[in-house]
């Protein structure tokens, strides 16, 4: 057995992987600015302190915390009914008494749906469905929200697309004066807000009040130098949403990189490159934590990162995909690692602004995201950002499989002579992400 196979075997059989995953789920949803997030951060600190031979640091930054005080959507008219809902992060507060208006049901809420409705949207409440989060034709809820604002909507409702009383949540507003009130609904709530049989529009009242305060947030960093000056960056976010346990998204990724670091720690000093692990927070708030961190790196520090491997939602389906961020050379590298370990990966080339790898790619650093269930809308991955994102959705075998696959990429990058893949210039990177900023 060669050293790589021994490493992967040790990770597969490590009981600490499942222990850490369960412990992270025990902390709750880890919504930023809450006790749940703080408990998770302290847990990760404790686990990192147990690993010998690593350097530990913290990247501390100020940000404005937002929390929900009032959170209500009501169907108006005969048989008035209050619906299960969840205000979306940074929703604008409604005026006293709430925002009342007619509801325009835009179906999936893709650009063509907005253009078809046109002026009907102005001054009314736009209702759209949440897309399956990872697919070739996925439109992010933030784009739908921006279109709602562009077409003059007074409010925005995002509904989960399938039955089950699963309320949708997520980040969409920008904390700017142009924001509009926004809330997530369940499929069943949206069904009550569709166009009436006589062709009239349903009416609803949105009531949202948030609380805002400035706090400090913390990215946790751990690193082990290798023989050379370059680094392999391994990242995952530990924050989440407060509807459930944020198990798939992203206790899976955080537990995985803990185990990879634990297993590789004694081996990295003999590798060509060092290993730097980052546990990011505020990922669910527009990728803020990694944005701040990567932007604060010097040009030399960014050029010293050979590749970023980002783990986010690595269970929920047995099938794994690599989002290669438009770095075409990464595709052959991914295929090569897959061939070495006997595992196929679906490769998705277009840049995706859906996790922390994006902030590396936009600064010229080759970056990939490992994710389960791409283009599998019937998989358990579709339950992220809902009350059903709980630990039972991540079978042990899938979590182990995702962790071992990630470790294979990291091991290859640590030991590969010469560049992993070329970096991009600032101009090339800007062109790559044009339209996503």
Question: What annotation goes with each model-predicted range?
Answer:
Residues 2-35, 166-172, 176, 239, ...:
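N-terminal capping segment at the start of a domain
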Residues 76-78, 82-115, 171-247, 259-274:
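Soluble metallo-hydrolase cores and metallopeptidase-like ectodomains found primarily
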Residues 14, 19-125, 132:
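Noncatalytic luminal/extracellular "stalk/propeptide" segments of secretory-pathway proteins
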Residues 23, 57, 105, 125-129, ...:
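Structural recognition of the beta-strand scaffold that forms the well-ordered cores
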Residues 12-36, 45-54, 120, 124-131, ...:
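Catalytic-core environment of secreted peptidases
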Residues 190, 227-229, 242, 280-381:
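Metal-dependent peptidase/peptidase-like ectodomains
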Residues 262, 266, 273, 377-437:
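His/Asp/Glu-rich mid-to-C-terminal helical/loop segments that flank catalytic regions of hydrolases
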Residues 4-11, 26-35, 105, 130-139, ...:
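Second-shell loop/turn segments in exported
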């Amino acid at each position: 057995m060669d050293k790589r196979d021994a490493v992967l075997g040790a990770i597969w059989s490590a009981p600490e992987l499942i222990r850490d995953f369960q412990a992270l789920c025990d902390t709750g949803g880890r919504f930023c600015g809450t006790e749940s997030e703080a408990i998770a951060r302290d847990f990760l600190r404790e686990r990192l302190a147990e690993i010998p031979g690593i350097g530990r640091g913290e990247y501390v930054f100020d940000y404005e915390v937002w929390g929900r005080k009032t959170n209500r959507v009501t169907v108006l008219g005969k048989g008035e009914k209050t619906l299960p809902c969840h205000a979306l992060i940074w929703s604008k507060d409604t005026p006293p008494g709430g925002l009342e208006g007619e509801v325009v049901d835009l179906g999936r809420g893709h650009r063509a749906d907005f253009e078809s409705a046109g002026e009907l949207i102005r001054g009314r409440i736009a209702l759209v469905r949440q897309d399956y989060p990872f697919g070739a034709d996925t439109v992010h809820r933030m784009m739908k929200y921006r279109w709602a604002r562009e077409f003059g909507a007074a409010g925005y409702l995002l509904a989960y697309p399938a039955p089950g009383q699963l309320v949708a949540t997520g980040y969409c507003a920008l904390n700017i004066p142009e924001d509009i009130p926004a809330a997530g609904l369940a499929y069943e709530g949206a069904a009550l807000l569709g166009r009436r049989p006589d062709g009239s529009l349903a009416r609803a009242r949105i009531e949202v009040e948030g609380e805002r305060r400035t706090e400090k947030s913390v990215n946790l960093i751990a690193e082990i130098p290798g023989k050379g000056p370059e680094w392999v960056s391994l990242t995952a976010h530990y924050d989440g949403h407060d509807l459930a346990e944020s198990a798939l998204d992203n206790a899976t990724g955080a537990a995985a990189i803990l185990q990879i670091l634990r297993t590789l720690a004694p081996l990295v000093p003999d590798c060509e490159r060092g290993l730097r692990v980052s546990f990011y927070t505020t990922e669910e708030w527009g990728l803020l934590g990694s944005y701040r961190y990567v932007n604060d790196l010097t040009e030399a520090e960014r050029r010293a990162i050979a590749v970023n491997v980002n783990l986010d939602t690595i269970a929920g389906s047995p099938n794994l995909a690599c989002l290669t961020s438009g770095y075409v050379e990464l595709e052959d590298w991914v295929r090569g690692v897959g061939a070495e370990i006997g595992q196929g990966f679906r490769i998705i080339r277009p840049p995706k602004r859906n996790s922390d790898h994006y902030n590396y790619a936009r600064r010229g650093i080759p970056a990939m995201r490992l994710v389960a269930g791409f283009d599998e809308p019937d998989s358990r991955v579709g339950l992220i950002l809902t009350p059903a994102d709980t630990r039972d959705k991540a079978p042990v075998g899938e979590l182990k499989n995702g962790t071992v696959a990630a470790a294979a990429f990291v091991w290859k990058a640590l030991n590969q002579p010469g560049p992993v893949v070329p970096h991009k210039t600032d101009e090339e990177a800007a062109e790559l992400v044009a339209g996503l900023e």
